[in-house]
Amino acid sequence: MKITLLPGDGIGVEIVDAAVEVLDAAAKKYNFTVEYDKKLIGGAAIDAFGTPLPEETLASAKASDAVLLGAVGGPKWDNVDPSIRPEKGLLNIRKGLGLYCNLRPMKVSKYTAHLSPLKTERAEGADLLIVRELTGGIYFGTHNEAHLNADGVEEASDIEMYTRPEVERIASFAFEAARKRGGKVTSVDKANVLGSSRMWRKIVTEMRDKEYPDVELNHFYVDNCAMQLVLNPKQFDVVLTNNIFGDILSDEASTIAGSIGLLPSASLGDGAGMYEPIHGSAPDIAGQGIANPLATILSVAMMLRYSLNQDAAADAVERAVDEVLEAGYRTPDLWAEGLKKVSTAEMGKLVAEAVK
């Protein structure tokens, strides 16, 4: 199995190194072989090649079974031409790989529930997966910048549009994911106002009735879903959303977990999937050995499950993370009195040993 490693910028190098140690441990235990190809992306690529996504990086990613990304960006590149900002590398590799499905799991364990802004009893045990459509909707519709209309009034517009195939492929992924989890999909829309949402709801309902009768389906308006995530996050299993609603709801859900240092993500298409923590490059702590690698390690677990077909290894990595947290080990961002403070590399080693 070939994995393209994209450490990127800031703490990306440290957290990817820790995650690779865990992946190697899983490969050894479950008897599969991993080959790595390390490439540049983001600011590091700008410094070396003058572009945030060199051709050789994209070529490597396309030839891989999966891509593991650290993080991109930092103040060093704030004043470069907007067309070559580090974040452009991320957008362009997603486009180049044809990634249309973003997965954002949010799980609150008993070891981390106290970090949530919600009451512990409300947050603990929450375990949901947001399935967000990535390539359609208002972000990719027709954009009309501010201009004067025929009446001399300034106006601007952005068009939300989806096609049936776009809805079907993302809904299919959500239903399949639900079959492997709690068997429930909550589809989010604004069908009381938007025509695109009414079509979305119709297609999702048809698919459930025809292809997934074993999966429970309910529909929430996006405003109600945002409220229910706070009131009772444990009611959700798989949350299916369009692009803009998923952008907002996934960030809301991440705050419930209490620490972005624990949250992985995956972006999938028909080829290689890309896996990354949801946090940024944190250049202020880069090189100090204090970054939390657990989100990247849990992204490796997602990679094992969704791209490498190694479900047992994925389960083992997730169990190993829980075991290390249960034993009281924490990186500085999660440390409190009575716990054992460890470095980035030490945390990676502890999880790798727990996998073994």
Task: Please identify what each model-predicted range represents.
Residues 31-55, 227-229:
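N-terminal beta-loop-helix "entrance" segment that forms/cooperates
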Residues 9-12, 65, 131, 174, ...:
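Buried hydrophobic positions in well-ordered alpha/beta secondary-structure cores of metabolic enzymes
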Residues 135-136, 141-181, 185-187, 191-193, ...:
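Glycine-rich phosphate/pyrophosphate-binding loop and the adjoining helix
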Residues 43-46, 229-329:
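Glycine-rich phosphate/nucleotide-binding loop
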Residues 4-21, 26-27, 150-223, 235:
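Glycine-rich phosphate/diphosphate-binding loop of Rossmann-like nucleotide-binding domains
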Residues 42, 111, 220-227:
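Short acidic loop-to-helix transition motifs that present clustered carboxylates
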Residues 24, 28-32, 63-66, 95-102, ...:
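Generic secondary-structure signature for well-ordered alpha-helical cores
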Residues 47-157, 244-246:
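N-terminal glycine-rich phosphate/adenylate-binding segment common to multiple enzyme folds
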